[in-house]
């Protein structure tokens, strides 16, 4: 099966953490987000992958190569300037041809059952199927309103609290039929949520929304990045793929075998402490974060070359635990 991975982002809001790295190369507990996504695709059977690049494409090309070390066949499309999510995918028409295909963003951590999503799409004969996920802070995302059959009736882009009527947000993960891409013009910026989906609804093309189990987190802000890193340490990014090949081990060729990932033992306390620190989007995290609450201490910081995230949690009467 085929997948298009959108990996052109620069990650300006994460600049204090990533330096000049492309956004998909952000290290998540020692492993780039991009590596985790390629492993997720392989485990779900999406082994034919086209990656759209824009910002510093040579970094990702050198890192990923032809995809063989991940167990996938990898091709690239380089944009001289951003073309929007749908515009970038439209430029890959020679890749997807007449097949339904997956679209996934390179700036989120995810453990969805993507194979199950693909099967739901085919059963519904939808133009597009959207992976939905509940979010307690939905104001920065697009909300999706559905009928009882799961068909999308309306989109609410980044609402205020007065207009929040659901917690299901658009994750930017889609199964797309080629007929939907016929609505996307060539050679001009075009976005799925802002441009294509309203056209499809106006044309009475069915858009299916599927609430997903598992884990999903957009790492677009420093606050979300650190929260996601703690979730990974706590084991929340485990695969949720009942329809996929469960016997396939993780394939992360660039993971450091000398690093250990261990659960934080009192995660509820740590997360409450982090929340109370009120990390604001765009804050400077160059030197990481150090919090104290009674006898508890929590330190989160990039290592010297920003290739990993180091987390140290010290309990009042316990030996220090270090997770790399």
What annotation goes with each model-predicted range?
Residues 34, 60, 92, 107, ...:
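Residue-level signal for inorganic ion chemistry
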Residues 241, 246-324:
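Phosphate-binding and adjacent anionic-ligand microenvironments
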Residues 8, 54, 133-134:
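Histidine-centered beta-alpha loop that forms part of the nucleotide-sugar donor binding/catalytic region
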């Amino acid at each position: 099966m085929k997948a298009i991975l959108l990996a052109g982002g620069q990650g300006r809001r994460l600049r204090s953490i990533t330096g000049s790295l492309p956004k998909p190369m952000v290290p998540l507990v020692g492993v780039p987000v991009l590596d985790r996504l390629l492993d997720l695709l392989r485990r779900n059977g999406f082994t034919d992958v086209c990656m759209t690049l824009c910002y510093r494409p040579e970094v990702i090309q050198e890192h990923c190569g032809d995809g063989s070390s991940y167990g996938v066949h990898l091709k690239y499309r380089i944009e001289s300037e951003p073309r929007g999510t749908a515009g970038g995918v439209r430029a890959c028409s020679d890749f997807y041809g007449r097949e339904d295909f997956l679209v996934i963003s390179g700036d989120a951590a995810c453990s969805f059952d993507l194979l199950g999503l693909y099967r739901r799409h085919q059963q519904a004969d939808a133009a597009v199927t959207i992976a939905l996920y509940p979010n307690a802070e939905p104001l920065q995302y697009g909300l999706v309103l559905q009928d009882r059959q799961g068909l999308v009736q309306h989109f609410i882009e980044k609402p205020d609290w007065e207009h929040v009527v659901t917690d299901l947000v658009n994750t930017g993960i889609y199964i797309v039929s080629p007929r939907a891409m016929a609505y996307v013009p060539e050679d001009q910026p075009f976005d799925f949520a802002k441009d294509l989906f309203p056209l499809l609804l106006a044309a009475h093309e069915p858009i299916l929304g599927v609430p997903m189990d598992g884990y999903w987190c957009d790492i677009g802000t420093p606050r979300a990045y650190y929260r996601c890193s703690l979730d990974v340490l706590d084991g929340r990014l485990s695969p949720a793929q009942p329809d996929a090949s469960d016997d396939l081990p993780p394939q992360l060729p660039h993971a450091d075998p000398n690093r250990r990932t261990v659960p934080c033992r009192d995660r509820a306390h740590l997360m409450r402490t982090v929340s109370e620190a009120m990390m604001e989007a765009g804050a400077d995290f160059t030197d990481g974060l150090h919090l104290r609450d009674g006898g508890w201490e929590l330190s989160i910081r990039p290592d010297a070359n920003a290739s990993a995230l180091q987390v140290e949690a010290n309990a009042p009467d316990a030996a220090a635990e270090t997770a790399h």
